[in-house]
Curated annotation (Swiss-Prot):
Species the sequence originates in: Oryza sativa subsp. japonica
Name of this protein: Zinc finger BED domain-containing protein RICESLEEPER 4
UniProt-annotated binding residues for Zn(2+): 77, 80, 101, 106
PROSITE patterns: ZF_BED (PS50808)
SMART domains: ZnF_BED (SM00614)
Subcellular localization, as worded in the UniProt entry: Nucleus
InterPro entries for the chain: hAT-like_transposase_RNase-H, HATC_C_dom, RNaseH-like_sf, Znf_BED, ZnF_BED_domain_contain, Znf_C2H2_sf
Amino acid sequence: MDEMIPKPLISNDNEMMHGHGYTTMVHGNNEILNGNELAVHAEVIPSASTRGQKRKSAIWEHFTLVDVSDGCKRASCIHCNQSLAYSSGSKNSGTSHLTRHIAEWCRVLKDRQKSRRYTTYNSSNENASFDQERSCLRLAKMIILNDYPLHIVQQPAFLSFVDSVQPNFKMVDIGTIETEVYAIYLKEKDHLQQALANIPGRISLTVGSLTTNQSIRYISLAAQFIDSEWRLHRRVLKVMMAPWPQSENAVSRAIIKCLSDWNMQDKLFTITLEHDCSSHDIYSANLRNHLSGDNILMLKGQTFAVRCYANILNAVAHGVLASVHNVIYLIRESIKFIKADDAHENKFAEIAVELKITSNNSLCLDVTSEWNTTYLMLLAALDYRQVFTLLESYYDNYGTAPSTEDWKKVEAACGFLKLLYAFTLNIMSAEGNHQTANMFFHDAWVLQLELQNGMAHGDDVIRGIVIGIHEKFDKYWKDCNVVLAIAVAMDPRFKMKMVEFAYSKIYGPTDAAKYVKLVDDAILDLYKEYAAQPELLPLSPIYVDQVPADGLPFIETGGAPATASPSTAAAGAGLVDFDMYLSEVTTMGQPFKHELELYLEEALTQRTPDFDVLKWWQDNTLKYPTLSRMARDVLAIPMSTVGVGSSVFLPDNGSRSLDDYRSSLRPELVEALLCAKDWLQYSP
């Protein structure tokens, strides 16, 4: 259904209009009307075929003369039947007032002209280019992209609307629209497979879940990668019903089959799982064992499994709320009491004014499944804590005001929720290239430190809140801090300096060294694996790389590079021991260092608000050809299973849910709709 754009109804100045036996000259901005329409305020020049005829003005196409008495005639509008004076005896009123009537007053004619303009345009343009198949395809895309139900094609109001826009479109049935959806899904899948086959680096996978109202669980797999232009992408690969009976082995096999279908086994870098330790520990181990057996995982799978950062933040937040659930109940009931009656609300506001309480927060009830709304409810309630207490003295039937001790618990809980809320917003606010893996380390180490300090806090209230949540996040930190650290080390603004600083805060100056060494060793081992792989990019002539026995390319940091003759090059094949020796000593004060050493030793890049880490690596690819390949894959690790632009404030179980309509569809149709919606967003 193409958008209709009416043709202009005003011709250019001095354009000659021919028709109906007369010629109309349009002057200035005078309006012309096509067909039987009148050229208003235009000079009418009789044509040869009309000379000598009575009433040469085209106005008489819109009026008829009616004799009303002897010598008196009136002009009757043929459109609205209004009667206008024309002549009385020998006196003639002329036609100017008749022209004004047609141009300005006759509503019937105006409505008819509007309809004719649309019909004329529609018949001369739209019908000529109308394509039933194309319109059906666009209808299917509209349904996919807007989450409309397939049975919209049967809804009377929609049918009426389509008929008014394009009467020639023959509405299709549900079966036909399903076929269109599948065709779009298969076409877009083929495009994505071709794109993934040509990306320069590895691909990381996310595994999420969707629940339904029928207690059926779907598994969603998405790929994240950085393309040749150093742009970060995430694409859904598959949405499948969880195997039944559900088991960790069955889920592992389903994921492996998906990797095989997409030819991704050899390109897989990491896999990010939702934070459900009870099952994911098992099937992540299954996946690691299977893929490590084929020798396709980097670092032998040590950094293969990553836990979802958004999930752990949600789990910790719900843990904080659980520690004060009794107080939350009292606050909810108090707000309900206040909002239930205008008199209660007015009295509440009156007390707040008397107490000179000024707050930008307004009382509101929360959505119990979204912890951020509960946090905002508690935050507002804290501002008015004195009002809640005084309100009891005015109403005998109000008895749910929190106590002083209760407010102390809420204040402590909000201290932790403030951090969690800010960190979660950081994930949601990251757009496009900015949700790279390096951005997660900062918030994670701060939260780990805060929870550690909370465990040792002298206040029983704070310690009571932290006890329930520290174990959850500590498990995440132990599993993922090395991956997080490697990622932030690939940020030239921080490198290993940020890791050293954070670890000294968390572990203390003495113990920090051994944890820093773990990260140092992991980065070096990972770099060696990339260095041992074939170089994919041409080297800059300034940086001359040589690959010794340990697989590390070395860069000569001083002096001019020598030009080797063929005989010298051949002899070089037997100098492996010498190359290894050079890697350990310096010659003539000119050390040989590999790219990783040079990168880490260089001064930190200045921190600016608009810094783009991917742009930095793109600009420095020739300087660090091997390290940039490693950085491309590391920065593409999805630390969260939640995509950009999606809400990360999840229910306590950490799962998203399908709506009732999609829950009722066949699994293959659910997959086609969800995958195609994701892919169509990026189609030209």
